[in-house]
Regions:
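Tubulin/FtsZ superfamily GTPase core signature
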Residues: 1-173
Length: 173
């Protein structure tokens, strides 16, 4: 993957990697190989999103089977990739084009991506809060230099403004 990513990046193609780190209970060799691969990939892509499998243990029940937990890990990866592609491909009230996404993701290194849902009066803030505080990620948005917030659903301009204000408060912007 790092070789293909580097070739694409060298041609000016925006490259985004989304990877998982093995569970701690897996063989040490597997973790060492994964960490080595992540380091190589980090140098070969514009943006890298790393999701530690151990974080899945924080969102599943103790009775969750191993296959179900691994399916959850796959879902998280799928949501991350889908979220990025939807920014460009799915029409929205405020549309982003590929240039906007490139500006935020080109040569940025490790990134944070979160997905959240909310209901009720503060649904937009609840959704953004859930996204930025996702237990599945090791990163934080504190100090982030570039951010894309994609809020969908039946929300008002005030809801959207409140959600952005919440993010600005965290990032110090």
């Amino acid at each position: 993957a790092p070789v293909v990513a580097k070739l694409a990046k060298d041609k000016g193609i925006l490259t985004v990697g989304v990877v998982t780190k093995p569970f701690r209970f897996e063989a040490k060799t597997r973790m060492n190989n994964a960490m080595s691969g992540i380091e190589k990939l980090r140098d070969s892509v514009d943006t890298l999103i790393v999701i530690p499998n151990d974080k899945i243990l924080e969102i599943v029940d103790k009775r969750t089977s191993m296959p179900e937990a691994l399916m959850k890990a796959d879902e998280v990866l799928q949501q991350a990739v889908q979220g990025i592609t939807d920014l460009i491909n799915v029409p929205a009230v405020i549309n982003l084009d590929f240039a906007d996404v490139q500006t935020v993701m080109r040569d940025k290194g490790i990134a944070h991506i979160g997905i959240g849902e909310g209901k009720g009066d503060d649904k937009a803030v609840m959704a953004v809060k859930a996204a930025v505080e996702s237990p599945l990620l090791e990163t934080t948005i504190a100090g982030a230099t570039d951010i894309i917030i994609n809020v969908s659903g039946d929300i008002s301009m005030f809801d959207a403004s409140d959600a952005v204000d919440y993010v600005r408060e965290i990032t110090g912007d």
